[in-house]
C-alpha cells in the first residue's frame, strides 16, 4: 500500500518521522511537498473562502492541505492509496485498514461530530478522477469553499464509507489505535515551548480578552486562545509514543543530524522532542 503524506518546510521533519512510522511496517511512502507544487505556490497571497469568510492563502503551518487531492493523480489513478497529514503516525501496522475495502466505495475516512475528515483517506484511486488544477482554480475563484473541500462535500459523486476512528485517533492512544493524529496543533509534541506560528482562527481580540477575564475570575476558559507558545501534550501516552518514534527515526538515520539542527534553528521543531 502506497502512503502519501502532505507536507511543507515547517512540517517537513515531522512528515519524515511520520513516514518512518509507516516504513517500519513495510509500506511505501511518498511526500507531497508544498514547496514543490507550482500550482499551489502561484496562489500565495490570493483570497479564498473558508466557511463563507474571505481568507488569504499563506505558506503557514497548513499550506499543504490541498495537496491531499493530488495523490490519486500521482499514483496514476490506480490502486488503493492512503493519504494523510504530516502529524499522523502509525502506532500499529495500518494494513488492517484494507479489511474495510469493497468495490462499492471510492473513499474511506473517519467522521467526528458528523463531519467527514479528509486528513486521513483511504482512496481507491482508480475510481477517483479529481482534476487537481481545476479544484484549486475553483477554490480561488470562490466556487468551492475550503470547508466543503476539507469535508469532501465539494464532490457529491463520491461514494464514501465511514470507518472506525482508530484509523484517525485524535490526540489519544487506546489499545485499538492504529493511526494517531496529533490534531491539536498547540500541543504537537515536536513544537513544545516554541512561539505559536499559526492562525488560531477564532482568536479575535474580543475572544482573547474574554478568556483572559475568565481566567482572572477563576472561570473555565479556552487555554488555546490565550497561549503564545506551544504547550506540552497533556497525554503522557501520546507524548511518549511520539518521542519514541522521533528517537527511533534519528537512531536509524532516517532523519539526519543536519536536518534536525536545521529544523531546530528555523524553529520548526523543539529540541525537547529528543530529550
Regions found by a protein language model. Name each.
Residues 99-153:
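Conserved catalytic core of nucleotide-sugar-dependent glycosyltransferases
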Residues 1-3:
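Extreme N-terminal starter segment of soluble prokaryotic enzymes
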Residues 66-113, 122-123:
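GT-A fold catalytic core of metal-dependent nucleotide-sugar glycosyltransferases
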Residues 21-28:
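Short, acidic, metal-binding catalytic loop of nucleotide-sugar glycosyltransferases
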Residues 10, 31-33, 42-46, 129-275:
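A glycosyltransferase accessory/donor-loop signature
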Residues 71, 107, 118-122, 160-162, ...:
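Conserved hydrophobic/aromatic beta-strand scaffold that supports enzyme active sites
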